[in-house]
Amino acid sequence: MNDCSRCAGSTSSGPTHWSGRIRDIADFPKPGIVFKDITPLLSDGPDFASALDEMAQPWRTTPLDAVLGIEARGFILGAALARELRTGFVPVRKPGKLPGRTLIQEYALEYGTDRIEMHEDALPRGARVLIVDDVLATGGTLRAALGLAAQLELEIVGAAVLVELLALQGRSKWLNDVPLLATLSY
């Protein structure tokens, strides 16, 4: 178990000095959606480093074998976080993007379904992993990553997201006994 007392079932305590680097884009990717754009944060080295440090802090003493980063912006955060935590990185991709044999997990969208995949030999059974994504919205993608990890019989020590959209209640799809850190919440 880790010492992630601030992330078990809750979000962080409030905005940080870099939170202004996340901007709202109205009507993207479709009308009625307000998109949380993290690219201004990514382009500012010191603020990006501060955000990563906040994401990493609760997991620094947790033994990990890898970070699972969910496509696409979860790759950016996940790979950087894996380096910060001195562990491996495993990409969780959209269908048909990984060569070789993959495991597939389907999940529900508002209208229809989608899938994510990872290599079936990415990690040995029992490996300890942290799942990372940029935004927790409805929780479908994060829940699908849990399904992939379960197929490989991985031990999920927790999940970390940069932003949680509270109104969409994605946290309700997460496991109650597995810590979930949202560095910022809106």
Swiss-Prot record:
InterPro entries referenced in this protein's UniProt entry, alphabetically: Ade_phspho_trans, PRibTrfase_dom, PRTase-like, UPRTase/APRTase
Pfam families per the UniProt record, alphabetical: Pribosyltran
Transmembrane segments: none
Pathway: Purine metabolism; AMP biosynthesis via salvage pathway; AMP from adenine: step 1/1
A GO molecular-function annotation: adenine phosphoribosyltransferase activity
Entry-linked CDD domains: PRTases_typeI (cd06223)
Catalysed conversion reaction: AMP + diphosphate = 5-phospho-alpha-D-ribose 1-diphosphate + adenine
A Gene Ontology term for the protein's cellular component: cytoplasm
Subunit organization: Homodimer.
Protein task: Catalyzes a salvage reaction resulting in the formation of AMP, that is energically less costly than de novo synthesis.
Protein name per the record: Adenine phosphoribosyltransferase
